[in-house]
Design a protein with these regions (language model features):
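Juxtacatalytic substrate-recognition/specificity segment
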Residues: 21-139, 144, 232
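Sec-dependent N-terminal signal peptides
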Residues: 4-13
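Selective for proline/serine-rich intrinsically disordered segments
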Residues: 13-15, 103
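A broad, structure-centric signal for solvent-exposed, well-ordered loop/edge residues
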Residues: 8, 42, 88-89, 130, ...
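Sec/Tat signal peptide C-region and signal peptidase I cleavage site
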Residues: 16-20
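Acidic/His/Gly-enriched intrinsically disordered linker/tail segments
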Residues: 94-97, 102-106, 118, 138-259
């Protein structure tokens, strides 16, 4: 499950901290994104610009949403590329396991220059977070973290969500999975790397299950229930006909073959 370490990120709703030496950032951009950098290779900048635009369209479609708010002009999302992991963590204040972070209200993504596969995963994951919250209405109450991260993981790479059963079955044999109550109470900042990895894997698997078993339109309906202020149990009942979170946990475990 090495790939899950690569996408570990921090989801934030507070204002983005001041970036060090703001005047020293260079900028480039595309239709929907502004990219801030210092010494990032030109090839990386070109790929970030091109790939972020592809994610902007693909992720919206993957989640089954219809866009009404477009990131144009001054409303473009901003991507900050630090020169190293040390610089990124120093000025963003993120933990050592973080490869990227996103500040939802400001549509700001922070990461650092690294191998393309890792950076691409971070980019897709964080764009997924912004789109997910934007389509739900960022002024609404907070979502369950497992749903937030699971949706971002699915938007990032649906195929990888389908690969999690092998890892989850092995984890189940070695000591068990998180219950839904444990997922709901999970705090990444207070957890170890193995627990964080398991949390991401379970979260992405649950959301992947909802897509695979019920389809994209039902997930959009599920999210619409949250937008209307419904709680998790009522949203599950309305969109999927499930009795609530306990019913979802039972059906998901049956889907994995570990009930």
């Amino acid at each position: 499950m090495k790939e899950y370490i690569l996408i570990l990120s921090v989801l934030l709703f507070s204002a983005c901290p001041a970036h060090a030496a703001e005047e020293k950032w260079l900028t480039t951009g595309s239709r929907h994104f502004l990219i801030y950098y210092r010494q990032a290779p030109e090839g990386l900048l070109e790929r970030v610009s091109r790939q972020s635009e592809e994610y902007y369209t693909r992720i919206t479609e993957a989640l089954g949403f219809t866009r009404y708010n477009f990131w144009l002009g001054d409303n473009r999302a901003r991507i900050y590329i630090y020169d190293s992991a040390e610089e990124y963590r120093k000025y963003s204040g993120q933990p050592v396991w973080s490869y990227g972070c996103v500040f939802i209200p400001d549509k700001k993504i922070c990461s650092f220059s690294q191998g393309w596969d890792a950076f691409s995963s971070v980019l897709a994951h964080e764009i997924g977070h912004i789109i997910f919250h934007e389509c739900l209405g960022m002024e609404k109450g907070s979502l369950p973290l497992w749903l937030d991260e699971g949706a971002a993981c699915y938007a990032e790479n649906p195929a990888r969500c389908r690969e999690t059963p092998v890892f989850l079955k092995a984890s189940h044999r070695k000591g068990g999975l998180f219950t839904f109550d444990q997922l709901a109470a999970f705090i990444p900042a207070a957890a170890g790397e193995e627990s964080i990895r398991l949390f991401y894997a379970e979260s992405s698997s649950i959301v992947g299950y909802l897509f695979e078993e019920f389809g994209r339109d039902s997930f959009a309906d599920f999210c619409e229930e949250f937008k209307r202020g419904r709680d998790l149990d009522k949203a599950l009942r309305s969109a999927y006909g499930l009795a609530g979170r306990a019913d979802l946990e039972k059906s998901w475990r049956r889907y994995l073959g570990i009930l």
